[in-house]
Amino acid sequence: MGIYSSMYNSTFDNYYVCGATMTKIYNRETKDCFEQKEAGSLGLKFLYNTILGRLVLKLLVGPGISKLSGKYNDSKYSLRKIPKFVKKNNINMDDFIEEDYQNFNDFFTRKIKEEKRPMTKNPKRFISPADSKVLAYDITEDLMLTIKGSTYSLNELVNNEEDLSEFKNGKCLVFRLSVDDYHHYCYPDSGKLLKYNFIPGKLHTVRSISSKYKIYKVNQREYSILETENFDKIVYIEVGAMMVGKIVNNIQETFTKGEEKGYFKLGGSTIVILLKENELILDKDIVNNSKKDIETQVKYHETIGAKK
């Protein structure tokens, strides 16, 4: 879900339904695949490639709409959205700590019961940072990732501010969260923080709103370089929306495996983790599914690989 939040989604539901694409996802519990509808290209083509669409886009991403949408989701009036959201996304509220939600944003960042996300005690096992759908890639010089409608090389993902050569031939794990997922995320191993950086999002057209000029969109990102106890140095990247703060990180010098690292508010929903070569053996189902471009559904704290 992008920065347009509920306003964008209600306004452009028809475009998203008409242009939706189906993503194939593997369920590890049932060992079956299912399809999930994703926002399609029709709405985006209208917004980015037509004069009327670009006029609308300027309004949607402007500070006025963003603030108005944020204020609504922070108000008590947004509570009316919760029952419909729970039903539509088939959310089992028995899994979550019972709270007196003050608004929709309060509900969206709800906390899950600890026993619902157990964690292995084996220090050599690598765990999923979040409830999500994961794809694994080998890190090559020409690897490109498409995340929330933007395409990046790994260097672009960290704003060309890091030397990532030491991760060549390693693993790139992309964890995509959908609105029905638990939006808190954790550390996959114990260790210490080496560096943290914030990259603001932006969107602009060159000279004109005319459809012949390209729109350049960059999502807000935060990344941490972590020295872990069992998997050497890793890069941990959170990807949010374009121009609003949807990532909330608990920045700390040291951390333990499975400890909460932060959470996404409405609009932030992707984690990318880079690991060095010969550090991680991923579970076979994730490897095989990724080769076929099938996402594997995983849970917060769930084991997804082991120390090589």
Task: Identify the role of each PLM range.
Residues 2-4, 8-308:
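Contiguous, well-folded functional domains in the mature portion of proteins
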